[in-house]
Amino acid sequence: MKLIVNADDFGLSRGVNYGIVDAHELGIVTSTTMLTNMPATNHAFQLMEKYPKLKVGVHLTLSCGAPITTDCPTLINPQGEFRLTSQYLLLKEHGLSEEEVEAEWEAQIQQFYKRGVTPSHLDSHHHIHTWEPIIPVIKRLAQKYDLPVRTGFRNPPNGVRLWSDVIDAGFYGEGVKEKYFIELYEKFKAYDGTIEIMCHPAYIDEVLRQHSSYVEGRLKEFEMLTRIKLAEDVTLI
């Protein structure tokens, strides 16, 4: 069984950053994806240099913080922050400019290349890259930069490499239990492909509280990720 354990939200806050690198160093986290528009983004890039075995990709966002680009009126609220929330799927009319989304996401990706770093892969905050109106954008950017993308699409776009064969998002909230890993193993132990677990380990700080409604659960995830013992035939990649 081949397993990727990806920690989302690198760059969100220093507490999140330290929680992720410690969950990598002391636990089973193998990769992370970075929000490149947040207060602790520079801190996350600094930590990357200290943990070269930790794969780091881009956590594309339209729903956390403020955009990097300045000419994006369809993406922001009157305060200049992203106007979408995690409930974007409930919108009857999204009103987004595809051109503005593409320019913003390319700017987020470019934060890596400006520092001479190639990201490992692409995924997104609240899985928004799998939203039907956005899929043409993620396809073009993935092909332009030749980067694999987190799966989770209802119909994966042609010509896009996937980061894994399966994404399991059950390790969250009430699902953060040792039983989760037992059930995952039983389900996939004979599977030939690669499974990705999405997780959100963190130490709690005030910046995290300001930007996320999922707070205490992140510390619980950290504790589980640093103490769990996986079956001997599970290969972390």
Swiss-Prot record:
One Pfam family hit: YdjC
GO MF: deacetylase activity; hydrolase activity, acting on carbon-nitrogen (but not peptide) bonds, in linear amides; metal ion binding
Residues engaged in binding Mg(2+): H59, H125
Record keywords: Carbohydrate metabolism, Hydrolase, Magnesium, Metal-binding
EC number: 3.5.1.-
One Gene Ontology biological process: polysaccharide catabolic process
HAMAP family (UniProt xref): COD
Family of this protein: Belongs to the YdjC deacetylase family.
Function: Probably catalyzes the deacetylation of acetylated carbohydrates an important step in the degradation of oligosaccharides.
Protein name in the entry: Carbohydrate deacetylase
